[in-house]
């Protein structure tokens, strides 16, 4: 596997992880609510609103993440994404009540906001088969959506809701440190667009017909 292929694999897994982490709570809410002493029938309805700040920050912090990446480093921001989302997931598992879960999930949402404006920008860098790379990256993101209830449900079946946050968190942090080493050794450099691709930046010939 070439350095560029490995770079894309890291970025694709980042999209998978981004959506997976944002949906862990949707599956684990009932178990967490029961652990906090909420009534069985109303546990889900009572717990779900505590995830709302996470969803708001997931969107609201994206422009901030993009600005920091432009001023600082996209590779560094991807490292922050992996380690930050993993660490906050582990911290969320230590919650002793709904308010603490809301705070933990809100922090998780801040780090989750990094991926889309930063990771997808990195996927399209360098020209070439941009559409193909975006398509594959999108599949990984959708797999994260699909895998979240399956993975979380499996962990809940064998243990409890805390492990559902801890296990993915540990894996994400390990990947973050791996990407840091990969970038530190020069493997995460963005590919250069060819001179021909640079000369053709702009609208494709006949683009006006697409508007009719």
Label the predicted regions.
Residues 59-96:
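Conserved MFS/SLC helix-loop-helix module at the cytosolic interface between two early adjacent transmembrane helices
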Residues 104-141:
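Cytoplasmic helix-loop-helix junction between adjacent transmembrane helices
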Residues 23, 54-63, 145-146:
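Residue-level signature of mid-helix packing/kink "hotspots" within the transmembrane helices
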